[in-house]
């Protein structure tokens, strides 16, 4: 455990310092250790915002491998999925891997729970190791 995290997530902001995660350019997406107020989730599906997915798909000329490259590139550079053209992100579905100490017993979530995020990927620290599938018809990546 890394220690106490900010209630607003500013502890994850790398650039520029002192602002909230959504307008930030770069977030720390190192998930090896989490802060006491965080939940680490193994993401299974990214539901990419429609405007963002359409823009990425057009930039890639519809090529699935290029779509993967663009999405992986955004996340690698920014530590989150915030499309630099549209400014939008999306949401995820996944399984809770670890719950921070400050949340244990206080929030109705435990390791192994399947969850869907209710906040945008444009402010959520995200690390993608691999994109297995692109579902162009429903704006999803797996």
Where in the sequence are the language-model features?
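Short peripheral tails and domain-boundary helices/loops at the edges of structured domains
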Residues: 134-142
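Glycine-rich beta-strand-centered segment in the early N-terminal region that forms part
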Residues: 32-47, 58-122
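Short amphipathic alpha-helical segments
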Residues: 55
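A generic structural signal for short, solvent-exposed coil/turn residues
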Residues: 2-5, 18, 33-35, 88
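Short glycine/threonine/proline-enriched tight-turn/helix- or strand-capping micro-motif at secondary-structure
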Residues: 17-30
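A eukaryote-biased signal for short, well-structured alpha-helical docking elements
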Residues: 1-13
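A conserved mid-domain beta-alpha-beta active-site/ligand-binding segment of alpha/beta enzyme cores
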Residues: 10, 14-18, 79, 124-128
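Short, Lys/Arg- and Gly-enriched loop/turn segments at beta-strand edges
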Residues: 52, 121-133
């Amino acid at each position: 455990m890394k220690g106490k995290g900010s209630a607003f997530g500013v502890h994850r902001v790398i650039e520029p310092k002192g602002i909230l995660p959504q307008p930030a350019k770069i977030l720390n997406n190192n998930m090896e250790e989490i802060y006491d107020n965080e939940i680490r989730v193994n993401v299974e599906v990214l539901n990419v915002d429609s405007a963002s997915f359409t823009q990425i798909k057009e930039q890639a000329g519809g090529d699935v491998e290029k779509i993967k490259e663009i999405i992986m590139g955004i996340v690698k550079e920014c530590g989150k999925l915030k499309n630099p053209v549209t400014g939008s992100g999306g949401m995820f579905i996944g399984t809770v891997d670890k719950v921070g100490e400050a949340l244990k017993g206080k929030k109705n979530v435990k390791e192994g729970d399947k969850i869907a995020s209710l906040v945008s990927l444009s402010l959520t620290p995200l690390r993608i190791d691999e994109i297995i599938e692109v579902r162009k018809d429903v704006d999803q990546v797996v």
